[in-house]
Amino acid sequence: MAKEILNIEDLLKPETLEVAIDGKYLIVPTLSDGFTGTVAGGYAYAVTKKGTDYTVNELIYNQKDNTFKPSDEPIIITDDNEIFFITRTLEDPYNYPVVATEKLKTKDVKEKQVLQAFLAFADDRFKLGVYNVFLADEPFVYGDKTE
């Protein structure tokens, strides 16, 4: 099956009514930083859907199997009309990370809100303070092309 790369900002535009993210990967292109341990390349996160809810987990490399497996600790979870996501990871190094909660409104598209939460997470996770930014490019969605 053909693969596609989609810009998250394009998917969040008001004219985009439907967004398919189940089974896709959210990729964050990064620059190297020795202080925070950020490596150059891309960090990948898997999106899974159970019923109407989504979970986003970082993919961790398993050297034994030479495979990538989702971490046990999700960065985003939806539960009906609520979305939970991790913030304040590196941007504010003097405080602990927290789980932010947002209630979805009836007009909200859940998939778009998951992407919004991911952008908030990535913007925080790949920064140190307000001036050390390790994003090499905008995060994007990668996966099988939907017909």
From Swiss-Prot:
One of its GO terms (cellular component) is virion component. It is found in: Virion. It comes from the Viruses. Its main location: virion. Keywords: Virion. This is Virion protein 4. It comes from Enterococcus phage phiEF24C (Enterococcus bacteriophage phi-EF24C).
